Design a protein with these regions (language model features):
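Acidic/polar low-complexity segments with low predicted structural confidence
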Residues: 2-126
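Low-complexity, intrinsically disordered segments enriched in Ser/Thr together with acidic residues
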Residues: 353-372
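Hydrophobic residues positioned within well-ordered beta-strands of beta-sheet architectures
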Residues: 98, 115-117, 137, 318-320, ...
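Long, acidic serine/threonine- and proline-rich intrinsically disordered regions
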Residues: 11, 34, 366-548
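Exposed acidic/Ser/Thr-rich ligand/metal-binding surfaces
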Residues: 2, 9, 101, 108-316, ...
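A surface/secretory-pathway sequence property marking extracellular, secreted
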Residues: 6, 40, 319-342
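Extracellular adhesion/glycan-binding regions together with long Ser/Thr-
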Residues: 333-357
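Local beta-strand/beta-hairpin segments that build beta-sheet-rich folds
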Residues: 184-186, 359, 374-380
Length: 548
């Protein structure tokens, strides 16, 4: 496909960015995560070039405020993004649905119980034929010396697919980087003239030089920050096959700036030599997937999965409020959690695609019931978010109806009671993800035997759950553990793609989102987890990328 294009054209817990779970406030425990600042200097001369450096007095910022005007009458000017949101719609509005479940539907009345609960946000399915939101996309492409040959051709082909699928209301920009970064294409509307220019710039790409990932991302962030107008859905797609040893301390602030500019950030690493640790850290901070493309011929599919998801965003800035009627011990989620009190918290989710769900696993401390109470209210959940399905080009602020989590109180325990299947499945997802993260840390340190022991223990816990029937989630997690064991059996297996595949898997399960459906070819196990998280619209885009 690439050559044809060129010829034709000429502890079982995880939490967001922390080493432990989101706990209730404690006077003896403070968050360990700290944002590290990063600064850049631009090169003199070419206004589209930038090089990484420590901050120097008088460094001149580049101007990238030459984006094409939006053609959409409902477009929101960038300056208006900071204005207060309108009052929420009536509580019965909105496209997302909320539900709650508790591990055991009946709890002993006379004693305190610790139980798991589950709050699920579900987005409805939509059709690709429906009118979608316009997008601002910037592809940040590695054109260092290691990209020569087929790698660069595959990247060009992937970008061409994005161009071909774009609507005239979409805008696309290109940033390339090797030793320096360059804005190759300003943010252009994908009408006929814009498409032609985008294709021409894609064909001009050539490989050579070093790898300055941070410079490429800095340039893309500046473009997004300086836009005169913004499409409602915006994203940076960063693709590299290399390592930038100076980037780690620079990237956290860039992720924050991208978020402040209303922009998602997706990272793609391919080949055995890219810095999977760095890219997965960026993805974790950006609250997006890290995508490992094991074989270069799948770059096009990976881009299609990401862009197809972005084309189906139905909600942004989701704030899930959890008001506990009992103590809320722990909130298990990869997303930002703000504790309000011992029994209340707010979970912030950047966006949700059509057909996606987000599951928040909770640990609750339920006190003994007084008197002869038959039911206990455990928690009330509600969501506030920008709904993109109600008015084209505008996020209408919605406040959902509240849903309750309750449990029956009985005189005696029920030893034969089965735990709720869905709560158990999501609890297992959390546990397996934590095991994968811990095993990856062992493998990074060369402790492959310790990693194997940890994965074996996780597999035994999974198999000893005592289920009558294996669920789809259970089977996918079992396959994930089997694949990871193959990738952590030796230094060679770990460094030749193992690290990247496991980091990809960890982020996928944490976020409940996937962009690349291609199964691993070297792990020896056909994994089903990727298809478990891919949405119908993403899959349709992926299939389209294979057929056109």
């Amino acid at each position: 496909m690439a050559s044809a294009f060129l010829n034709a054209a000429a502890k079982f817990i995880f939490t967001r960015r922390q080493t432990g779970p989101e706990q209730a406030p404690s006077p003896t425990c403070a968050p360990s995560h700290q944002q590290r600042s990063v600064r850049f200097e631009t090169r003199a001369g070419d206004p589209n070039l930038m090089s990484p450096s420590s901050s120097l007095p008088g460094a001149q910022a580049q101007r990238f405020d030459d984006d094409d005007p939006l053609s959409d009458a409902f477009a929101t000017a960038a300056a208006q993004e900071s204005l207060p949101e309108p009052d929420p719609m009536p509580v019965d509005g909105g496209t997302l649905s909320l539900s709650t479940r508790v591990e055991y539907s009946a709890l002993p009345r006379g004693s305190t119980q610790e139980v798991f609960g589950l709050v699920t946000i579900q987005a409805p399915m939509t059709s690709c034929a429906q009118e979608r939101q316009a997008m601002d996309l910037i592809c940040v492409l590695d054109v260092s010396g290691s990209m020569r040959g087929d790698k660069l051709r595959q990247v060009q082909d992937a970008v061409r697919f994005v161009i071909d699928q774009a609507l005239p209301t979409d805008r696309l920009g290109l940033v390339t980087f090797n030793s320096f970064a360059k804005r190759a294409l300003r943010l252009r509307r994908m009408d006929t003239e814009g498409r032609d220019e985008a294709i021409a710039e894609t064909l001009r790409l050539s490989a050579g030089g070093g790898t300055s990932i941070a410079s490429g991302l800095e340039t893309a962030v500046q473009v997004m920050e300086q836009r005169r107008q913004r499409n409602r859905v915006s994203a940076i797609l960063l693709l590299t096959d290399g390592i930038d040893g100076s980037a780690r301390h620079r990237l956290p602030s860039l992720v924050g700036r991208a978020r402040a500019a209303g922009c998602a950030l997706y990272t793609f690493g391919f080949g055995a030599d890219h810095d999977a640790g760095l890219l997965s850290e960026v993805a974790e901070q950006a609250e997006t997937p890290f995508t490992y493309v094991e074989d270069t011929e799948h770059i096009r599919e990976a881009f299609a999965g990401a862009v197809g998801g972005l084309a189906s965003v139905v909600a942004q800035r989701v704030e899930l409020t959890l008001n506990g009627r009992v103590a809320l011990k722990t909130v298990h989620t990869a997303f930002a959690v703000r504790r309000v009190s011992e029994s209340s918290a707010v979970v912030s989710i950047p966006d949700i695609f059509a057909g996606e769900r987000r599951d928040v696993v909770l640990e609750l401390v339920v006190p003994a019931a007084e008197g002869t109470a038959e039911m206990t209210e455990l928690l009330e959940a509600s969501a506030r978010y920008a709904d993109l399905t109600l008015q084209r080009g505008v996020g209408v602020l919605v406040q959902s109806s509240s849903v309750l989590m309750t449990a029956e109180r009985v005189a005696e325990p029920q030893p034969e009671a089965e735990p709720d299947e869905e709560v158990s499945a999501q609890r297992e997802r959390v546990e397996v993800t934590q095991a994968l993260q811990e095993a990856a840390a062992h493998s990074d340190a060369g402790r492959y035997e310790a990693a194997q022991q940890l994965l074996e223990a996780a597999d035994q816990r999974l198999e000893s759950a005592g289920r009558k029937e294996k669920t789809r989630v259970h089977n996918a997690l079992a396959q994930e553990l089997a694949d990871a064991r193959g990738r952590m059996k030796s230094r060679g297996a770990w460094e030749q793609g193992g690290r990247a595949e496991v980091r990809d898997a960890c982020q996928m399960h944490k976020m409940q989102r996937c962009t690349n459906t291609a199964s691993s070819s070297k792990g020896g196990v056909q994994k089903s987890a990727k298809m478990m998280y891919i949405s119908a619209q993403q899959d349709e885009w992926v299939q389209r990328s294979k057929n056109c």
